[in-house]
Amino acid sequence: MILSNPTNPQSPQFRVLTDPQCAELYHAALECLQRVGIQVHNPAARNLLKRHGATMEDHIVRLPEKLVEQAIHTTPHEYTVWGRDDRYAMQVALDHVHFGPGPTCTYFVDPDTGERRKARRGDAGLTARVCDALPNIDYVMGLSLFDDVTPALSPVYEFAEELENTSKPIVAWANSPESFLDIYQMAIAVAGAESALREKPVFAYFTTYESPLKLANEPLANLMQAAERGIPSVCLGGPTVGLESPFTGASALTLYLASALGALTVVQLHVPGAPMAIGGLPSMMDLRTARPAYGSPEASLHGAAAADLARHLGLPFMGTAGASEAKRVDAQAGVEAALQVMLSALSGASLVHDVGFLDCADIGSLSYLVLADEIIGMTKRVMRGIEVNADTIMLDLIERVGPGGLFLNQARSASLCRKEAWVPSVLDRDPYNIWERKGSQTTEQALTAKLMRILGTHRPAPLAADAQKKISDILRLAEEREVKRQDG
């Protein structure tokens, strides 16, 4: 976790938007919701909004300002997502920055062969185990969309693997109300009781909205289910600039915020005070391919601006970093991750996801996750800033050693070396001859070596036997349900 900006005045200070700019964009989003409206494809959500004064035309709902403002007012400024081990409890609040992977990659880089293949069972477990070992990864998502299970149960199998392979908090997704309830029951099995899970939720629910201005049926149903059960949630999205919004950052931010506030309003009307974060990635359209460019500087800029808007409203925020257009872990991947991680930390985003994404979120890579962990470690050191006081200036020691002297043998100075100096675990600092003597290892080879050490030696804390059995039973019953559905 990184403390950023106002929470740590010693850290570098950074903002994209001024307070007046935030206010103008916020009021534009409110006006958009009132004049243009938002598609709401969940009947219960539409009825809820209508009962509270929204107007409706088919699936398009127009929200009064006061309704949205009340939703912002009732949303908690912070909440906690727990892991199986309380040491990893994650305070989700602005300027408390936590990093983790992303979900639903179609392809996965096989750690044994280094080749891209379809994601399959076991990949989320590998991801969770690596996250469990990496010191700068705070929570777990699966980096995979299983190709070899019943499609409706892909998120359920993923969550089961994650529970087994990490003690850190999990951010889970679901593709139906039934799969959400399967995941919820698994979490109860680990927590021990429904009341214990409500007190210390071991997962948060993640979903997305469609751009522009569209809230789909099942994500809204799951958001409402999560709120009823005290499970924190995140709703993330954002237009591809130039395709799903006009070609300006301001219009993209307006559409992002309007959509996010639409989802927030539904949740807060349903269960006032439900813990929820909004999230945004208004990414630039690549002018040659029309794909969203995750690694573009504009995506990082817009993400940081979206965090400024969340701070202006007092809402927890999910951003994006460690996601590249590169197809392998190469120089491009490193450049794009470094910019994203640094701007995410400076912006104070509460949760930062998609660490380990390659090829526009199509490939999950554990080696890239390891590289991002290194970059996050570097960024943490920058964000700690420079402590300035009489004890750190050490003028008395400077006077004692005098002009031309050295400080290496001064115990008072040397005792601070571990605190002041960041030491890499992958990046190379050896002189050329020593690097050559050690085998002339490239950065990609060093990342692979560290990854294989983790997979070969790290053993997460095991699940209790009764929890394992309950999870197996939930999977079996879910499969039986899906068979009946297909037969029926």
Task: Please report, for each region that a protein language model flagged, where it lies by residue.
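Helix-rich catalytic cores of soluble enzyme domains
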Residues: A119-L346, S350
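N-terminal small/glycine-rich loop or linker at the start of catalytic domains
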Residues: I2-L3, C22, Q91-T113, H312-S324
